[in-house]
Amino acid sequence: MTNKWYHEDIKLHLEEFYKVYSNRPIKDNSGGMKSPHMFPAWYILKKIQPKYIIESGVWKGLGTWLFEQACPNLEKIYSIDPSPHFRNYTSSKAEYQKTDFLDTDWSSLDKNETLVFFDAHQDCLPRIKKCLQVGFKNIIVEDNYPYQQGDCYTPKKILSKLNYCIDKDGYKRIHPHKEEDYNFLEKNIENYQEMPPIFKPDLTRWGDSWDENYPTPDSLLRETSKHDYPVFWEEKFDYTWICYIKLK
């Protein structure tokens, strides 16, 4: 499993994104993506330019808006969310549904022109297996929590090869590492890349030290740049190792 994009190239796109993000229609996206994940999602989509995006998890709709900015030739977004009443932004390019990704027939979609975006706090494995079964190659996993945090099973937890935590409803439960899950990802993933944070503060979003226990790509900017990008600095804690996956 290898990286697809270089740190230097990712950083070159920050200034352009800052201008895009400054014009976002939803300024307070609490509970959803903010700049630490909006930027890498935008970057990946600009590079891949899919015709179709499956968006699993819509929330207020800011991600949907972002997809339109990154992919001007986008033909359709299939936006999935069981709670559409939270949506503030509605796209003319989106087809909205409540039916889960796993329960939808995707056979008519052009697999080579589709990217699947998971932002639904769900077990990643059945979803990755569904992508493999259907033939989808390009995936973004937004909720890619490390082994000691988070409310769902993620690629980062699996690839850590460590016992992992699921923190749900106020209860933290430790689960044993599953070697068969690691082997499945190792066998079926061509590219796996955790996208870098824009800023990396001393503490994680959970308030503990952001050290070697949280392996992380080098940040794109240092604290000395915080006055140049105040919004990025303000939202620096909203990072959970968003990743790009290309299946074999």
Where are these regions (language model features)?
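A short alpha-helical cap/connector motif
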Residues: M1-V116, A120-K248
